Amino acid sequence: MTLESEIEGLWERYQEGLTAADAEPQVDRLIEEFLTALEAGEIRAAETVDGEWEANAWVKQGILCTFGLREITAHEYGDVTYNDVMGLLETDDLGERGTRNTPNGTVVRRGARLGSDVIMMSPSFVNIGANVGDGTLVDSCDTVGSCAQIGENVKLGANTLIGGVLEPVEGAPVVVEDDVSLGAGCRVTSGFVVGEGSVVGENTLLTPRIPVYDLVEEEILYGHLPPERRAFTRYVDSSVGDHDLFEGGAYKPAVVATH
């Protein structure tokens, strides 16, 4: 059996009521194999199919099984004792791969992958299922959520939030493609895709619910920013302004994209 088929079988059992208390030792061994494959980049929570990003549902099922079929235990991290169903990623090999993590607060959970020549500044957090590509900067106060796919040579500005998407399992995670620069304070959520080579201004919110006014192709987009764009926040008229409670009109955020 393949790892995929084994995880799918475990997911079926979990959906039928299997609990951490009932799980056999081989369940934990399977979950450990699964987490190790994620960390090695052998499997990923999403991949491109015919040029479009799609979730690997079975990988997200495996992550949910990890949470549901392992007992909470105490773990030590420096002088801190914390309680979780898994430990943190082993970082002994980071230096030999050219990856740096500064002290006092760079946290990478099991099941996440860090590429080579990555820089993680304190404090920052990378969650399970996330994939951070080679040469990427994760700056101070950044969060890379569960299953997020971050490309190579990406710059995540300080205080940037990359949202996690675990459920529904069919839902594609947030994707930031290669050579993207996100300014400080940006937030990318709910499966939004930031196209390769784009530069996004500080404090921009990218989410499928906010329209992207692409001035290059003169179209309004939802859920993705095309490659090689310069994007920033502006405000446009909102129909809410027609309500009597809003004297002088009302405005809603929008993203404007140019070359």
Protein language model regions, located:
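Structural signal for interior beta-strand "rungs" in well-ordered beta-sheet cores
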Residues: 95, 100-239
